[in-house]
């Protein structure tokens, strides 16, 4: 099936998402969708400042897929493109927006890493349209990006914004937010995950355990992740964002949701850690610790 992809950026106002065929991919995640005749879909992400939202349209013989990712660091970008390369597609068309504002160091590093990864795919890349380092992420819908497929032979890679509620961004009631913030505190650090896979009980327990103990400054109780529930929105942006002046309006509320989730998980963490140690095989993290201690 031959699908034409148009790269189209706009200043359109936000609209409600369709009730069917709409898929949101949050920060630190990717998800792959097959584009099938008669099945329209939209895959979408938002809130990007220094992050880069990337859509990779891959051709596999008669099949076409799109993989959407919200990438937030050079290591995350590199890990994602390892996954893309492993798909062993016949060709790739790559579209992206983000890495703003352009004078931010993280934005510059992310943009450079994305370009390197695209170049490393070599001749298989037939199209690369990358809108990076363009300006204020709050303007011209620069923080939004996705791909809309009409169910026929046309897809639009663009930045039409959608009006979403917190439960649509984080259906796990805060677990995704805890993952996003705490995943690099895991050993080894986790760069990216497949959003099509639900979190397991053990994953949420381990992430919540980290979140309950985490402080940005070990000597300052006020810097604890769980203390976010006591902070005003401006304090959250200043303390927990690398681009505090540019964050989306829902940034602070989403972090509060994650902190509340971790607090609510505290008794589950205590019970589960005891239960898991006694009745189930250790996680890879625990197994690694045992092996390295010998």
Question: What are these language model-derived features?
Answer:
Residues 36-88:
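Conserved mixed alpha/beta catalytic, RNA-binding, or beta-rich assembly cores of soluble enzyme
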């Amino acid at each position: 099936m031959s699908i034409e992809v148009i790269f189209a950026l706009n200043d359109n106002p936000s609209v409600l998402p369709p009730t069917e065929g709409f898929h949101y991919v949050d920060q630190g995640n990717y998800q792959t969708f097959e584009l099938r005749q008669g099945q329209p879909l939209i895959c979408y992400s938002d809130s990007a400042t220094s992050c880069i939202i990337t859509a990779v349209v891959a051709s596999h013989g008669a099949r076409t897929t799109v993989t959407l990712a919200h990438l937030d660091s050079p290591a995350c970008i590199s890990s994602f493109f390892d996954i893309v390369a492993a798909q062993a597609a016949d060709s790739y068309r790559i579209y992206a927006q983000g890495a703003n504002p352009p004078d931010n160091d993280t934005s510059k590093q992310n943009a450079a890493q994305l370009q390197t990864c695209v170049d490393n795919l070599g001749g298989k890349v037939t199209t690369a349209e990358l809108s990076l380092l363009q300006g204020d992420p709050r303007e011209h819908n620069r923080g939004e990006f996705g791909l809309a497929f009409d169910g026929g032979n046309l897809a639009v890679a663009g930045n039409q914004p959608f009006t979403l509620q917190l439960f649509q961004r984080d259906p796990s009631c805060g677990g995704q937010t805890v993952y996003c913030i705490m995943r690099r505190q895991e050993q080894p650090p986790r760069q990216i995950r497949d959003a099509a896979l639900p979190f397991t009980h053990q994953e949420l327990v381990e992430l919540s355990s980290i979140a309950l103990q985490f402080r940005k400054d070990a000597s300052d109780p006020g810097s604890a992740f769980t203390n976010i529930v006591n902070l005003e929105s401006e304090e959250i942006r200043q303390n927990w964002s690398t681009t505090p002046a540019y964050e989306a309006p829902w940034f602070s509320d989403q972090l509060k949701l994650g902190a509340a989730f971790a607090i609510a998980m505290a008794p589950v963490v205590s019970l589960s850690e005891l239960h898991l140690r006694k009745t189930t095989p250790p996680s890879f993290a625990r197994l690694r610790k045992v092996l390295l201690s010998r």
